């Protein structure tokens, strides 16, 4: 877990075997992110940035507004949770990135998203 003075990020990822097709180099992963507002004032998630790296060292950058179609406002002491997905051409990879957020005064700040692994279960001992 990574903490800033105001926000913490927790990530869990799973392999989605039912949507994957290893013979066609299609490995589907879902990840759930929990964003907790540890501060005393509301914050809002404005943009996201991801760096996705597969085990062939191929990197893809993804950026855009909000997450899953929302730019959530997170009140003090509460959390926002969402699930999204990534498709890799290899059975192993990583994701990392950051959220661009604003505080209650409209001041921007960045929250790092820790590196997390995307891996089919048989690869992890």
From Swiss-Prot:
SUPFAM superfamilies, A to Z: ApaG-like (SSF110069)
PROSITE patterns (alphabetical): APAG
Domain ApaG: 1-125
Coiled coil: none
One GO biological process term: error-free translesion synthesis
InterPro entries in UniProt: ApaG_domain, ApaG_sf, Uncharacterised_ApaG
Entry's transmembrane regions: none
HAMAP family: ApaG
Protein name from the UniProt record: Protein ApaG
Organism the protein comes from: Photorhabdus laumondii subsp. laumondii (strain DSM 15139 / CIP 105565 / TT01) (Photorhabdus luminescens subsp. laumondii)
Gene (name only): apaG
